[in-house]
Design a protein with these regions (language model features):
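Acidic donor-binding loop of glycosyltransferase active sites
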Residues: 261-280, 295
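A conserved mid-protein helix/loop that constitutes part of the nucleotide-sugar donor-binding site
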Residues: 40-44, 199-215, 233, 324
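Conserved acidic donor-binding segment of nucleotide-sugar-dependent glycosyltransferases
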Residues: 310-323, 332-338
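Donor nucleotide-sugar binding/catalytic pocket of nucleotide-sugar-dependent glycosyltransferases
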Residues: 139-182, 187
Length: 369
């Protein structure tokens, strides 16, 4: 059933630049250990390089501020100067473009690829920093790589881009599939799950999701919030007021996979905004993870998540971002057990076929090197 654009991309042009595998890569990453879709995406790119026997080294920006940026620059220069090999810079976030541009002056650097996601692209473009990033991305030797067609379209007024849709590493993929097989019978409790970096709980639409669950007036529904990072006090207060709501922090991959596989529905209710405090999903990798685990999804009403599921087949999206629209989407799914069971089967089949990890490393090499 893999007929969507993301699946087609996965099998297109996989031989392009295949003979450039011996090129070394220096990966500039915006964080490590903070969790979230961007970190998972970058980790999968690292796995793909290793699979293709591309030498890859990584430098992380673990803190904000000038000192941390200068340290990243110094660490990058040290690694580049330690080897005479030709090196491609892979920039894990466009905010790191100033550092990458300085590193590109090193004689061993042979161009760069910059990964673009969602709100990093449609944030307020008139801010001085955004103007600088946009100018740097237009320089010769810079290749913009978007996570989805939606993000690529948003980038179009800034620069041309290619698309590298997300996928899952072989190990993570197999963990999710195994969790699906291990969960044989759903309990009488109707489990809903959402997952995100906990500091982003408002942007991920948790208040609207909680209100939508309350509107179901069903005693059998439970909502589990899986997250990484330290939970903010206001989030803890919100969760504590609902005995059907629980918070699971810092789960291992195996534990997270079981949460996905055990759920009747996975819900991602991300809010979409443009401007100075932009927010939104460029793809929604966690939607793909849930479907590989065999769970149908409710996706954000707006943004780039349409590439991450098959509408009406493996999941749905509410008509808008209101709690009322989300409540309607949830109730329509839960009140039709036959449809929900069909979606579970199709979610697993579609996600595992369309995003099979075997072909992804070659695609990464062709798009980034």
């Amino acid at each position: 059933m893999p007929s969507d654009a993301a699946s087609s991309l996965r099998h297109a042009d996989t031989d392009e630049n295949v003979f450039r595998r011996n090129e070394r890569v220096l990966l500039l990453a915006p964080s490590q250990g903070l969790g979230g879709g961007i970190e998972r995406y970058i980790g999968t790119v690292e796995w793909a390089f290793a699979d293709q026997k591309v030498t890859s080294q990584r430098v992380d920006l673990n803190r904000s501020g000038l000192r941390a940026h200068l340290k990243m620059l110094a660490d990058g220069r040290m690694l580049l100067r330690a080897s005479p090999e030709r090196t491609r810079l892979v920039v894990g976030h466009r905010a790191l473009m100033p550092i990458a541009t300085l590193l590109a002056r090193e004689p061993t650097v042979s161009g760069m690829s910059v990964l673009c996601y969602g709100d990093d692209v449609w944030n307020e473009r008139l801010r001085p920093r955004r103007r600088i990033e946009r100018a740097l991305m237009r320089r010769p030797g810079v290749r913009a790589v978007a996570i989805s067609g939606f993000t690529a379209g948003t980038l179009a007024s800034d620069c041309q881009s290619t698309i590298l849709p997300p996928a899952l590493s072989q190990k993570w993929f197999e963990t999710l599939v195994a969790a699906s097989a291990a969960v044989q019978d759903l309990t009488p409790v109707t489990q809903l799950v959402t997952a995100f970096r906990l500091e982003d709980w408002r942007n991920k639409g948790l208040p609207q999701l909680i209100e939508a669950v309350r509107a179901q007036h069903r005693k059998d529904i439970r909502l589990t919030i899986c997250g990484s990072g330290e939970p903010p006090p206001d989030l803890l207060r919100l969760v504590s007021t609902h005995d059907w709501c629980s918070l699971r922090v810092g789960l291992t991959d195996s534990e997270l996979a079981i949460q996905f596989a055990s759920a009747a529905l996975f819900v991602l209710a991300t809010r979409t905004r443009i401007g100075r405090h932009a927010n939104g999903e460029g793809f929604g990798l966690v939607l793909l993870e849930a479907q590989v685990a065999g769970t149908p999804v409710i996706a954000p009403a707006h943004g780039g998540s349409s590439d991450a599921y098959m509408d009406g087949v493996t999941g749905v999206a509410p008509v808008n971002e209101s709690a009322e629209a989300l409540a309607t989407a949830i109730s329509e799914m839960l009140e039709d057990p036959a449809r929900l069971a069909s979606m579970r089967r199709h979610a697993a089949q579609w996600a595992r076929e369309s995003f099979a990890p075997e072909s992804y490393p070659r695609l990464v090499a062709s798009k980034l090197l």
